[in-house]
């Protein structure tokens, strides 16, 4: 069973172990935002149980369960920052956001593959605007799974995810995409899912940069998920006992 499957089964079956997070508490050198702090500032937050109730009957969840069995984790970069642990968390955010945003199954398929392979163009963990473009050159294995429009949409999303929002339309025209609104909607979800996992890099996530209202409801959860599941080299050897205690 892959790491994706192991973690998602725990997540879906409501068996994850979350430590209680308090404002200003320091975990692995990261400060986190508490649910109480966020809601006091006007950002209503979804709890873990809320999220489970929302997605448990969704056909998107069923597709996710089946699709992650087919992932070749060797394609994911070997990195503590942008490797498998990041992709697992970001893909869970994509699932939640897609359900909250009432995304169709067909659009979700594109969105899920986009987040799984969005960082395969990386050669290091530094800021690199070109890693999205470089990733598109490695997507040939997906081409037979989609029609031209859908495959170009995935390439557009992956190339654009590492660029500023003001470049979205320029890249959109490059791929001659017909369903522009759909492509831009998928891109927003990908960028937000990626951003929600930035608690691994920064003291806390700046909510104002999130693009959808649904994403702003997941900030506390993202802090909890990172704290509970972080295959960081600092404690890679004991994460299994921590996760399944």
Task: Give the ranges of each region predicted by the language model.
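Inter-helical turn/loop segments and adjacent helix faces that build the functional surface
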Residues: 101, 141-150, 209
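An active-site-proximal "capping" alpha-helix that borders the catalytic cofactor pocket
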Residues: 89-97, 130-144
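Alpha-helix C-capping/helix-to-loop hinge sites
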Residues: 78, 97, 120-123, 142, ...
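His-Asp-centered metal-binding catalytic motifs of divalent-metal-dependent phosphohydrolases/nucleases
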Residues: 90, 106-126, 131-135, 155-164, ...
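Divalent metal-dependent phosphate-bond-processing catalytic cores, especially two-metal-ion Mg2+/Mn2+ enzymes
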Residues: 2-55, 74-104, 163-245
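Acidic catalytic motifs of isoprenoid enzymes
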Residues: 69-75, 145
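Alpha-helix N-cap/helix-initiation sites
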Residues: 80-87, 104-110, 128-129, 148-151
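Outer-membrane beta-barrel translocator/channel fold
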Residues: 60-67, 167
């Amino acid at each position: 069973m892959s790491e994706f499957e192991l973690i998602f089964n725990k997540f879906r079956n409501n068996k994850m172990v979350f430590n209680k997070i308090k404002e200003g508490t320091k975990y692995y050198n990261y400060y986190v935002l508490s649910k109480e702090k966020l809601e006091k500032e006007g950002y209503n937050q979804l709890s873990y149980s809320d999220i489970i109730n929302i997605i448990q009957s969704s056909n998107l969840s069923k597709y996710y369960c089946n699709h992650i069995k087919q992932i070749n984790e060797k394609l994911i970069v070997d990195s503590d920052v942008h490797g498998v642990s990041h992709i697992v968390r970001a893909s869970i955010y994509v699932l939640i956001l897609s359900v909250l945003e009432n995304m169709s199954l067909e659009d979700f398929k594109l969105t899920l593959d986009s987040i799984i392979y969005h960082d395969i163009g990386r050669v290091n963990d530094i800021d690199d605007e070109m890693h999205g473009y470089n990733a598109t050159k490695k997507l040939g294995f997906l081409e037979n799974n989609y029609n031209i429009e859908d495959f170009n949409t995935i390439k557009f999303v992956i190339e654009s995810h590492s660029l500023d929002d003001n470049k979205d339309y320029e890249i959109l025209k490059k791929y001659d995409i017909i369903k522009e609104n759909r492509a831009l909607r998928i891109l927003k979800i990908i960028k937000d899912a990626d951003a929600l996992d930035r608690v691994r890099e920064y003291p806390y996530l700046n909510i104002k940069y999130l693009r959808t209202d649904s994403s702003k409801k997941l900030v506390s959860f993202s802090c909890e998920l990172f704290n509970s599941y972080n295959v960081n080299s600092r404690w890679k050897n004991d994460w299994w006992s921590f996760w399944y205690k």
